[in-house]
């Protein structure tokens, strides 16, 4: 069946290991409750009716994914990821050539709220470039002196945002920008940075700050708290 204008595919790069978690198990396979972090992240995407397919890019040597219920989900496609995030995203984009718009979501960002996702998806009505979920910087920001544990100066926090995911773009535009940026040796830290490199200005959609990425050991307990709270609120 051909994709419609309303249908959205999602790409989840899940080939990384996450050494800062200090565990032998890749962070996306750590459990919160009775699900892995990856399952929480993917189910949050599939909970929206516009998301019709999720492509998960995993490491070619990954033996854990096949043990998850996701492996047999009819809306899930699995592809081999690459050494870098951008390589995995490109592999996912190639698997959804029919899609007009794509979401890219971190495998280890399990606390996505449906209202944030809905507001992000709504930008496809007015934007030809796409945008990202982001949260305004609230803390005082310091720039350090290179190579020293010392403050160089305070960074003005006005107009500073924390980039979150999902990030949402026209598939062809994202594919072309990622390809160009990689071919030209640009540093790409997220999908929006590839569009920025090519001269585009994605929209900032304010999202909740509790949409955290599990990166360090202390993040796991915080994500568990946020998810438990959300489940209780939904049941209330």
Swiss-Prot record:
Enzyme class: transferase
Record bears the keyword Nucleotide-binding: no
Pathway listed: Isoprenoid biosynthesis; isopentenyl diphosphate biosynthesis via DXP pathway; isopentenyl diphosphate from 1-deoxy-D-xylulose 5-phosphate: step 2/6
Annotated site residue numbers, Positions MEP for the nucleophilic attack: 157, 213
Keywords annotated in UniProt: Isoprene biosynthesis, Nucleotidyltransferase, Transferase
Catalytic activity reported: 2-C-methyl-D-erythritol 4-phosphate + CTP + H(+) = 4-CDP-2-C-methyl-D-erythritol + diphosphate
GO biological process terms held by the UniProt record: isopentenyl diphosphate biosynthetic process, methylerythritol 4-phosphate pathway
Entry EC number(s): 2.7.7.60
Domain of life per record: Bacteria
Record's keyword annotation contains Signal: no
Site (Transition state stabilizer): 20, 27
Pfam families: IspD
Self-association and partners: Homodimer.
Function per UniProt: Catalyzes the formation of 4-diphosphocytidyl-2-C-methyl-D-erythritol from CTP and 2-C-methyl-D-erythritol 4-phosphate (MEP).
Name the UniProt record assigns to this protein: 2-C-methyl-D-erythritol 4-phosphate cytidylyltransferase
The encoding gene: ispD
